[in-house]
């Protein structure tokens, strides 16, 4: 399917989430792409699926949503990825990630190699960099991305794929670094999350990596944004949680759109992202249907 020329690329895993409520398309970079698309931003998913029924169905779903599949390669031997997700009584999800799958070997398609030269930004995560093949592909994209394009690094530490040194290297040169409070605490001090330390951790990470914008999410407590040396905090609002799968990805999509649009204050950008993330937490799965017009 050919869609409008995308302004953003999302590099990384695309897979199936095996949830108690059913099978849902997932993978953080794909989830972000879905929400960018639903919120009116052009995007190209850069990933891989297998030559199997699950891969066929993923592509069919994306095309049905109007997403361009030209950046999704087909791996001849490896299967389409999936994770087994368990949701707790309060809606929090934990994951068992299956290894040696198609998204571990992302091949950059001709469409990706053409569009990266005019992209406004590249969103990439840490999980897909568990393979050296993908790490090389990511560096290939970063090397030819326009100088003024945003480099958005979405940390996703999932044991055993949680190398702090790799995360620090990938964060260097990023325009925006996004991670949760537990990940920030681990990277900064090696300790557990502690409420109230988000600003200090964000400033430490900004100084360590040189990243000018650091966002730390803290679940239902809210989220913080460090930008141009100024710290902003937006408290979470109570919602009826169905599950939290994809809420952080929807948050990131909204934050990126708002910050890149440069029409709202940084505090307003953060608040908008929180509200959209909260709405997704009231829905099942990472890719809920948006209201007509995509407005929330």
Predicted regions, residues:
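Ribokinase/PfkB-type carbohydrate-kinase core domain
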Residues: 1-9, 61-64, 69-74, 89-231, ...
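Conserved post-catalytic alpha-helical subdomain immediately downstream of the catalytic base
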Residues: 6, 17, 38, 44, ...
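Active-site beta-alpha turn of Rossmann-fold NAD(P)-dependent dehydrogenases/reductases
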Residues: 12
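A short, flexible beta-alpha/helix-coil linker loop
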Residues: 15-17, 129, 158, 183-185, ...
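Substrate-binding N-lobe of the ribokinase-like
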Residues: 17-92, 97-103
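Short, conserved glycine- and acidic-residue-centered signature motifs
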Residues: 25-29, 134, 248
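A general structural signal for well-ordered alpha-helical segments in protein cores
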Residues: 29, 33, 55, 81, ...
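Ser/Thr-centric signal marking residues that sit
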Residues: 80, 217, 244
